[in-house]
């Protein structure tokens, strides 16, 4: 929904068709967390909600980013109406341009990584961290910040060691 590739009615139709074809499979979709709040009709056909949370893109300072993530999660849980919510993507870039109070840096990326993983472990929230490696191919579309979300760089070197 976020990118506008598909309208909600078509996505709902695809989910319904999948549920008929594979009835024992938990079915849902992945999108930005607020899209599930905006489209309750989409939530109704999902068994599970997979939401992307990026406090960086919303300009949160790294010291407040974990609390911001928790608020995003609560908004999504409310929209999910009892369905399981999995954080499908979250992360922090290590370089690039600031987004309001959000500053990309190796230190900030590690702070966010540690804080979000501690919180998710303590709360029993499933979380996928984005990303394992930098994606240098993204520089054309998203600049330095878009290619710099990895825990390791493009040469498989752990960023915090260098």
Predicted regions located by residue number:
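Aromatic- and acid-rich polysaccharide-binding/catalytic face
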Residues: 31-68
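Acidic (Asp/Glu)-rich catalytic clusters
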Residues: 20, 40-45, 78-81, 121
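Aromatic-rich peripheral "rim/lid" segments of glycoside hydrolase catalytic domains that contact
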Residues: 98-106, 119-162
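Active-site groove signature of glycoside hydrolases
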Residues: 1-6, 37, 87
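Conserved, mostly hydrophobic/aromatic
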Residues: 49, 87-89, 127
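Glycoside hydrolase catalytic-domain groove-lining segments
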Residues: 54-98
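Generic structural signal for well-ordered alpha-helices
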Residues: 8-19, 69-77, 113-117
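Short beta-strand/loop segments at the ligand-binding rim of alpha/beta enzyme cores
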Residues: 19-29, 82-85
């Amino acid at each position: 929904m976020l990118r506008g590739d598909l309208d909600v009615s078509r996505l709902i139709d695809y989910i319904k068709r999948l549920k008929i074809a594979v009835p024992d499979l938990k079915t849902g979709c992945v999108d930005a967390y607020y899209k599930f709040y905006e489209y309750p009709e989409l939530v109704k056909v999902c068994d599970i909600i997979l939401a992307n949370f990026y406090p960086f893109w919303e300009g949160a300072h790294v010291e407040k980013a974990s609390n911001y993530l928790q608020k995003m999660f609560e908004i999504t849980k409310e929209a999910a109406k009892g369905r399981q919510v999995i954080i499908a993507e979250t992360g922090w870039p290590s370089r690039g341009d600031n987004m309001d109070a959000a500053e990309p840096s190796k230190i900030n990326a590690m702070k966010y990584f540690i804080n979000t993983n501690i919180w998710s472990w303590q709360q029993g929230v499933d979380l996928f961290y984005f990303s394992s490696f930098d994606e240098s191919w993204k520089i054309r579309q998203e600049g330095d910040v878009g290619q710099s979300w990895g825990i390791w760089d493009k040469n498989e070197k752990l960023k915090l060691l260098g």
